[in-house]
Amino acid sequence: MDSGALWQDLGWQPDTLQARSFERLYALVLAGNTRLNLTRITGREEFWEKHLFDSLRGLAAFQDQKEPSLIDIGTGAGFPGLPIAIAHPDWYVVLVDSVRKKIAFVLSTIQALGLTNAQALTGRAEDLAHRREHRESYDLAVLRAVAQANVCAEYALPFVKLGGAAVLYRGNWEVQEEVELARACRALGGEIVEVDAFELPVSRAVRHCVVIRKTGPGLRVFPRPAGLPTQHPLGAIEGAPRVESEEPEEP
């Protein structure tokens, strides 16, 4: 399947510069992968589908938004943030990860691609979200292959402006996950507004994008210190087994 057919499923086509940037991104990831073990997804078609298409499909509902600020939490090798920055040169994209070597790769990639609308930071969401320059400062937050949905919400919503949204990229989606996420959102000032199910165009694998709208300020204590969100997830149903949802392939 050629990459042009993938874009048709998005209702969008890259211009010549963007197409070259995607090709260059693929080459840079392959080169970086020999040193850093960035991703298991290295085949061209699989990369195009699971890193590029999937990254952009998650924000289909926001394609026409004008000059939003976006934070990609737990970006890893730069997904979904780098494809978003390439596809939307008028968006301001901040990519965050706690692993310094990965952020060094992302920074070098931003420079190599000439992306003037993106920057990368080393740090944990639990710390950065309490800094004034990041607290409730972004129109959108995205998380892909990071943690359970309710944990992701605790990481994301403190970064989001009132009226903004967090988008969680998920694989399978279970009823228990949605119940626990809704419970967590009540403490975080959020509300689930959409669970968008779709198929990837080549493998036909099912994906879900969960959109959470920021409706209130939430409690200042969130996110809790590092470790607590995963050890004691907000909204978890006591006695229920932890849902290990299949997430999008880790970068």
UniProtKB/Swiss-Prot annotation:
Residues covered by region (Disordered): 224-251
GO molecular function: rRNA (guanine-N7-)-methyltransferase activity
GO cellular component terms listed in the entry, alphabetical order: cytosol
Main location: cytoplasm
EC number: 2.1.1.-
Keyword Cell division among record annotations: no
Keywords: Cytoplasm, Methyltransferase, rRNA processing, S-adenosyl-L-methionine, Transferase
Intrachain disulfide bonds: none
Location(s) in or outside the cell: Cytoplasm
InterPro entries xref list: rRNA_ssu_MeTfrase_G, SAM-dependent_MTases_sf
The keyword RNA-binding is assigned to this record: no
Organism superkingdom: Bacteria
Signal peptide (UniProt feature, chain positions): none
Residues that coordinate or bind S-adenosyl-L-methionine: G74, F79, A125, E126, R144
Family named by the database record: Belongs to the methyltransferase superfamily. RNA methyltransferase RsmG family.
Function: Specifically methylates the N7 position of a guanine in 16S rRNA.
Stated name of the protein: Ribosomal RNA small subunit methyltransferase G
Species for this entry: Gloeobacter violaceus (strain ATCC 29082 / PCC 7421)
